[in-house]
Swiss-Prot record:
This is Matrix protein. It is a peripheral membrane protein. Changing residue 11 to C: In strain: Isolate SAD1-3670 var 1 and Isolate SAD1-3670 var 2. The gene is M. Residues 115-151 are annotated as: Essential for glycoprotein binding. Homomultimer. Interacts with nucleoprotein and with the cytoplasmic domain of glycoprotein. Interacts with host ATP6V1A; this interaction plays an important role in virion uncoating after viral entry. The keyword Zinc does not apply. InterPro entries: Rhabdo_M (IPR006870), Rhabdovirus_M_sf (IPR038617). Changing residue 168 to I: In strain: Isolate SAD1-3670 var 1 and Isolate SAD1-3670 var 2. Changing residue 120 to L: In strain: Isolate SAD1-3670 var 1 and Isolate SAD1-3670 var 2. The record marks 95 as: Involved in the inhibition of stress granules formation and contributes therefore to virulence. Residues 9-31 are annotated as: Disordered. GO terms for cellular component: host cell cytoplasm; host cell endomembrane system; membrane; viral envelope; virion membrane. It comes from Rabies virus (strain SAD B19). Belongs to the lyssavirus matrix protein family.
């Protein structure tokens, strides 16, 4: 069984790079676990610990031989250990990655680019999550290489607190996004007046 080498390059600071080796068996297809800092839909109460964020997310998949979501799960399964951004917002980043990857990629040479530009309302359990007024600008490159295959992920998430208005209605996000999370349904409410505004409930 081949050992997979994972090299993480931290681009949060352009002058700084960080690497972290790891290994995983090829036949291991575990899904991500849902981020525990999010409040389950049935526990949603009032507006406590809610934060509105205008999200600009971009995930670029670099692979000369194509890729599958199984490989992406291999890369992302240890995301908690290699994440280089603000840890109060790691759950937000996970959800943005999942939602971005549920969309249609735009080819860019031998690469595929997934983009997400939405306004979400997040609610965190207890006192978890970002502070009032806190924002995020996160960028990181994750590379997966087993000497026979190479897949790189370039992740960029910008989250700025903002305000949205209008009535909302319930929808379910593309199930492909949920494939990255075990036993998790990404349920949202979307504004009738603004198709890019959603309330992320779970």
């Amino acid at each position: 069984m081949n050992l997979l080498r994972k090299i993480v390059k931290n681009r949060r600071d352009e002058d700084t790079q960080k690497s972290s080796p790891a290994s995983a068996p090829l036949d291991d297809d575990d899904l991500w676990l849902p981020p525990p800092e999010y409040v389950p839909l049935k526990e949603l109460t009032g507006k406590k610990n809610m934060r509105n964020f205008c999200i600009n997310g971009r995930v670029k998949v670099c692979s000369p031989n194509g890729y599958s979501f199984r490989i992406l799960r291999h890369i992302l399964k240890s995301f908690d250990e290699i994440y280089s951004g603000n840890h109060r917002m790691i759950g937000l980043v996970k959800v943005v990655i999942g939602l971005a990857l549920s969309g249609s990629p735009v080819p860019e040479g031998l690469n595929w680019v997934y983009k997400l530009r939405r306004t979400f309302i997040f609610q965190w359990a207890d006192s978890r999550g970002p502070l009032e007024g806190e924002e995020l600008e996160y960028s990181q490159e994750i590379t997966w290489d087993d000497d026979t295959e190479f897949v790189g992920l370039q992740i960029r998430v910008i989250a700025k607190q903002c305000h949205i208005q209008g009535r909302v209605w319930c929808i379910n996000m593309n199930p492909r996004a949920c494939q990255l999370w075990s036993d998790m349904s990404l349920q949202t409410q979307r504004s009738e007046e603004d198709k890019d505004s959603s309330l992320l409930l779970e």
